[in-house]
């Protein structure tokens, strides 16, 4: 890359990076501005989500009251932007409103201390008290007729309750995307409550929304963790890699512009600024659709949809075809004598260009692998550009990439072969044993949940052809391991987990993969109550029964970390036979009591406990 070319690109990048797509003049009243931009319906929905994500224990009715008060105030400001308090920031207005809740100290304890702080510290304080695992009752789905009656009696309240229940259980759910889920939720009830067989129509749709919602929440949680724990630079690097894969025909300056604005949108949502986030996301979708000719050939269908569907579609759109005539990367990033000069002039721009060029050529790599390669390249330049002969030093840098690429390729190949051999449930059990031995201090429910989710990588990704396996698998595993990191951060019990979670975002998965059995772990005392079961297990769904069995498996490994595969297999087969036998018995409870004692004794003998 000639020096003059780099300078012109640097100018383009810098202006795009600092400016972005959004052009916002200062407004006298921010709340009036957002109300006018979003409209009353979206404004109220977003304020409800915001309050439910902060005050996760408050009753629905209390939140509705707060939302109505904020909405009436916003209307006052729309009528007269110079009215009293209309010039206050949204953080100030929302924070003041949160602090009026009479039961704040009683319900949330030390979170009430946030109210003594000034902005922006007050909002930061509220954010730190968001609970990823709130103590809320499990959502139980009512009968279909009951739901349809509630939907017809008061559609608005029914949909608000959906937003409220999801938002308070998922305090980082991407708010504009939750509005999209609510649109689909409403459509499902509108269609199915009129169907001949309401349940057959509705239940599969609700199951699909639930599963997609959990996945969407987990993906957004990783984005927020990236911003909160590793900073804006880490998020921008992720966005450069992902958008370059998705839009390989777009120019670097265009990708940079999109990255700047995508970062702004996610920073706002992760920071609780949901009105700004939704408004800016709509502007970004508008910009992408107005400039699709210079971005991607795959956007036309998305851009014809209504706003919420459009934004969702753009976020999920398939990768565009790679340009046919891309030159070798080596010329600009290895062979050129100007590498160190270009790097010294603008390190992040040069690394951003490297990441852009590498990612657009490799849709078959995971984003985290691309970021590992960029980090290796950066480390090499830091070392070599200070050496006596820089070019000689960095000439073989691409050779260092080979083991980094082969490690996830081999791991995915081995695990997909294992998955195809075992099936999902037994593959999950394999991971349960593996991870319990690595980090036995982690709570049993967390180990079960994380290992079950890790095990789903098989059915999610192994069916894909080779070029799509790695981006599917490794980026999915990053999302699941972030769930472990988030849950562990609240109540840390393992230095190994803390180390893998905090040292490097992109190396989390390799760090966990490399962990061996924890030899320092002192096995738990055997407790027969852990393995005592009752007749209620017979009425559980297949999924709930699996979780019961997997919970027992984790406990067995915690009692006997050095148990062999064969020993564990024998015990689990005996357990399955025991459950099957007693669930068929006439007197189930007696069977579970008598046969259960025998099972515990046999398990202890088999494991040498």
Swiss-Prot record:
Residues the entry annotates as binding Ca(2+) 1: 30, 268, 273, 276
**PTM annotation (N6-succinyllysine): residues:** 229, 460, 543, 588
Q: Where in the cell is it found?
A: Secreted
Recorded hits in InterPro entries, A to Z, give: ALB/AFP/VDB (IPR000264), Serum_albumin-like (IPR020858), Serum_albumin/AFP/Afamin (IPR021177), Serum_albumin_CS (IPR020857), Serum_albumin_N (IPR014760)
> What intrachain disulfides are recorded?
77-86, 99-115, 114-125, 148-193, 192-201, 224-270, 269-277, 289-303, 302-313, 340-385, 384-393, 416-462, 461-472, 485-501, 500-511, 538-583, 582-591
- Provide the positions where the record notes the PTM Phosphothreonine: 107, 444, 446, 570
Known CDD domains for this protein?
ALBUMIN (cd00015)
State the GO CC annotations: blood microparticle; endoplasmic reticulum; extracellular exosome; Golgi apparatus; protein-containing complex
Provide the coiled-coil residue spans.
none
Which residues comprise the propeptide? 19-24
**Top-rank taxon:** Eukaryota
How this protein is processed and modified after translation, per its record?
Answer: Phosphorylated by FAM20C in the extracellular medium.
Residue ranges occupied by any Albumin domain in the UniProt entry: 19-210, 211-403, 404-601
Report the leader peptide range: 1-18
Q: Which residues carry this modification: N6-methyllysine?
A: 558
Annotated (4Z,15Z)-bilirubin IXalpha binding sites: 264
What residues bind Ca(2+) 2, as annotated? 37, 279, 283
The entry's function note states: Binds water, Ca(2+), Na(+), K(+), fatty acids, hormones, bilirubin and drugs. Its main function is the regulation of the colloidal osmotic pressure of blood. Major zinc transporter in plasma, typically binds about 80% of all plasma zinc. Major calcium and magnesium transporter in plasma, binds approximately 45% of circulating calcium and magnesium in plasma. Potentially has more than two calcium-binding sites and might additionally bind calcium in a non-specific manner.
Q: How does it assemble?
A: Interacts with FCGRT; this interaction regulates ALB homeostasis. Interacts with TASOR. In plasma, occurs in a covalently-linked complex with chromophore-bound alpha-1-microglobulin; this interaction does not prevent fatty acid binding to ALB.
- Family from the record: Belongs to the ALB/AFP/VDB family.
* Descriptive protein name: Albumin
Organism this protein belongs to: Pongo abelii (Sumatran orangutan)
Question: Highest lineage ranks of the organism?
Answer: Eukaryota, Metazoa, Chordata, Craniata, Vertebrata
């Amino acid at each position: 890359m000639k020096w003059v070319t780099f300078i012109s690109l640097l100018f383009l990048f810098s202006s795009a990076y600092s400016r972005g797509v959004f052009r916002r003049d200062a407004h006298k009243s921010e709340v009036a501005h957002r109300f006018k931009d979003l409209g009353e319906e979206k404004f109220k929905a977003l304020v409800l989500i915001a309050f439910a994500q902060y005050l996760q224990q408050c009753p629905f009715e209390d939140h509705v009251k707060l939302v109505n008060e904020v909405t009436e105030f916003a209307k006052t400001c729309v009528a007269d932007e110079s009215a009293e308090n209309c010039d206050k920031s949204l953080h100030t207005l929302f924070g003041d409103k949160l602090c009026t809740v009479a039961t704040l100290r009683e319900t949330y304890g030390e979170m009430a201390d946030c109210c003594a702080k000034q902005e922006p510290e007050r909002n930061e304080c509220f954010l730190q008290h968001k609970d990823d695992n709130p103590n809320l009752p499990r959502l139980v789905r009512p009968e279909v007729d009951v739901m349809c009656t509630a939907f017809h009696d008061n559609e608005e309240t029914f949909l608000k309750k959906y937003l409220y229940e999801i938002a308070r259980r998922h305090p980082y759910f991407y708010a504009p995307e939750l509005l999209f889920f609510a649109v689909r939720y409403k459509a499902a009830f509108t269609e199915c409550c009129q169907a001949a067989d309401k349940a057959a129509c509705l239940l599969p749709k609700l199951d699909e929304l639930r599963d997609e919602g959990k996945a969407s929440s987990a993906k957004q949680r990783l984005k927020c963790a990236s911003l909160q724990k590793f900073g804006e630079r880490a998020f921008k690097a992720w966005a450069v890699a992902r958008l370059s894969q998705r839009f390989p025909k777009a120019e670097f300056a265009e990708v940079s512009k999109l990255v700047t604005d995508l970062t702004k949108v996610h920073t706002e949502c992760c920071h609780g600024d949901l009105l700004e986030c939704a408004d800016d996301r709509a502007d970004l979708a508008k910009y992408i659709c107005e400039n699709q000719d210079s971005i991607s050939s795959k956007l036309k269908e998305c851009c014809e949809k209504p706003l919420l569907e459009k934004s969702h579609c753009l976020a999920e759109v398939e990768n565009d075809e790679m340009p046919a005539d891309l030159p070798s990367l080596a010329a600009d990033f290895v062979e050129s004598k100007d590498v160190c000069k270009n790097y010294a002039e603008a390190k992040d721009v040069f690394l951003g260009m490297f990441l852009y060029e590498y990612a657009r050529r490799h849709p078959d790599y995971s984003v985290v692998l691309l970021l590992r390669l960029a980090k290796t390249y950066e480390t090499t330049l830091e070392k070599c550009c200070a050496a006596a002969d820089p070019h000689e030093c960095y000439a073989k840098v691409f050779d260092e990439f080979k083991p980094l690429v082969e490690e996830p390729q081999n791991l995915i190949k081995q695990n997909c072969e294992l998955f195809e051999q075992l099936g999902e449930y037994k593959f999950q059990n394999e991971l349960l044993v593996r991870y319990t031995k690595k980090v036995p201090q982690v709570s049993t429910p967390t180990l079960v949940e994380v290992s079950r989710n890790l095990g789903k990588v098989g059915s999610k990704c192994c069916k894909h052809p080779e070029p799509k396996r790695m981006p599917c698998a490794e980026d999915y595993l990053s999302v699941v391991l972030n769930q472990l990191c988030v849950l562990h951060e609240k109540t840390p019990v393992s230095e190994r987990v803390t180390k893998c979670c905090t040292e490097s975002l992109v190396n989390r998965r390799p760090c966990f993969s490399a962990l061996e059995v924890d030899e320092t772990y002192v096995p738990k005392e055997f407790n027969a109550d852990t393995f005592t079961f009752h007749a209620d297990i017979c009425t559980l769904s297949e999924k709930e029964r699996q979780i019961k069995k997997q919970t027992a498996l984790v406990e067995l490994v915690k009692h006997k970390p050095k148990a062999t595969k064969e020993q564990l297999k024998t015990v689990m087969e005996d357990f399955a036979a025991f459950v099957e036998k007693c669930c068929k018995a006439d007197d189930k409870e007696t069977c579970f009591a008598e046969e259960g004692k025998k099972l515990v004794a046999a398990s202890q003998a088999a494991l040498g406990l």
